């Protein structure tokens, strides 16, 4: 029996279970399937039924690449290796930051003064014009959605850092709403210091580790795109770490990275995983290992990391180097392109899991 002779409802049910990265190839074989994959009802069914198969995305030298981690032999004391694949985004060669939410990528290019939301799976894209004439390198961005609505309403958060003539420091917030294609000023504060250029997203909300400007400690901050409010959450206590970062596991849990205890100058690297994530957050220790080689100043340009719970491994991307940890064994892999123009170096290091989807940009 041919596919075309099957009832349309059955075709839709079967296609809704095909992983997004393979479905993208099938669309080119049938106009009917291509049209079906672009409907909102199918995208919703596909999100519920299809197996999630994450890919790894890396921002290196202002370019976005697919990447992979070779785990073959790690249980026989053979070091895992990191392999850079093909470029994922070819339109703009000067990407300064990239953010992932629900299968959509938010791409920022300060050199070209562009902010774009793109679905690599469907090819759908949307350029977002700034409220004023330009975006700034000191800006922070996040993409999320209203998870209390029957249909996901995507929004972009822009965090603007300003230093006034008198030396006063202020952070302003703007929100871009896709439904009316416009920015609006959301609020301002003089208390926060957000230095993590690459926040993470879980179920539509965004998370950072931030510092209060008036106290020497860090805390956990979330932004709920449904209520459009920030909320302070708890970190594991005590948390006296100089280098911190967040990552996402299985699209539902957060991993927290802490390195270099400033109160004891200990070089222990610690990773925690959330056991509950909501208005109350609980953490469980995943990994502790003493790292000798990385210097603290290696983290000046930021870092990103991924955790593989099944293989008890961690991959950390820092200043053109990849730190691999499997159990209690670690090594450092150099990905530096010697002789390459340093002007192409990204202002931040981004390494993240990307789960393809048919999410539609609204």
Curated annotation (Swiss-Prot):
Record domain F-box: where: 1-46
CDD domains: F-box_AtFBW1-like
Taxonomy, superkingdom: Eukaryota
SMART domains: FBOX
PANTHER family noted in UniProt: BNACNNG10540D PROTEIN, F-BOX PROTEIN CPR30-LIKE
The protein, known as: Putative F-box protein At3g23260
């Amino acid at each position: 029996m041919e596919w075309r002779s099957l009832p349309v409802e059955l075709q839709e049910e079967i296609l809704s279970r095909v992983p997004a990265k393979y479905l993208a190839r099938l669309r080119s074989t049938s106009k009917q399937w291509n049209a079906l994959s672009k409907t909102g009802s199918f995208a919703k069914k596909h999100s519920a039924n299809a197996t999630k198969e994450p890919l790894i995305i890396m921002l290196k030298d202002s370019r976005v690449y697919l990447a992979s981690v070779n785990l073959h032999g790690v249980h026989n004391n053979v070091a895992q290796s990191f392999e850079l694949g093909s470029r994922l985004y070819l339109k703009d060669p000067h990407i300064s930051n990239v953010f992932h939410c629900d299968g959509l990528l938010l791409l920022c290019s300060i050199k070209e003064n562009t902010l774009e939301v793109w679905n690599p799976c469907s090819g759908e894209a949307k350029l977002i014009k700034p409220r004023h004439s330009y975006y700034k390198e000191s800006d922070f961005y996040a993409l999320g959605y209203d998870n209390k609505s029957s249909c996901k309403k995507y929004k972009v958060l822009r965090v603007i850092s300003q230093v006034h003539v008198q030396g006063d420091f202020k952070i302003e917030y703007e929100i871009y709403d896709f439904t009316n294609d416009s920015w609006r000023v959301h609020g301002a504060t003089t208390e926060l210091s957000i230095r993590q250029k690459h926040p993470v997203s879980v179920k539509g909300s965004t998370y950072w580790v931030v510092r209060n400007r008036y106290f020497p400690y860090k805390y956990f901050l979330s932004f709920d795109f449904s209520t459009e409010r920030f909320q302070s959450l708890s970190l594991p206590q005590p948390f006296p770490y100089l280098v911190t970062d967040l990552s996402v596991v299985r699209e539902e849990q957060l991993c927290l990275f802490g390195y270099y205890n400033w109160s004891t100058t200990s070089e222990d690297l610690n990773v925690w995983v959330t056991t509950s994530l909501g208005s109350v957050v609980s953490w469980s220790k995943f990994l502790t290992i003493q790292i000798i080689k990385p210097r603290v100043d290696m983290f000046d340009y930021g870092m990103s990391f991924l955790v593989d719970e099944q293989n008890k491994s961690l991959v950390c991307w820092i200043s053109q180097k990849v730190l691999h940890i499997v159990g209690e064994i670690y090594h450092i892999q150099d990905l530096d392109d010697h002789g390459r123009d340093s002007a192409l170096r990204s202002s931040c290091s981004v390494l993240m899991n990307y789960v393809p989807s048919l999410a539609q940009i609204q």
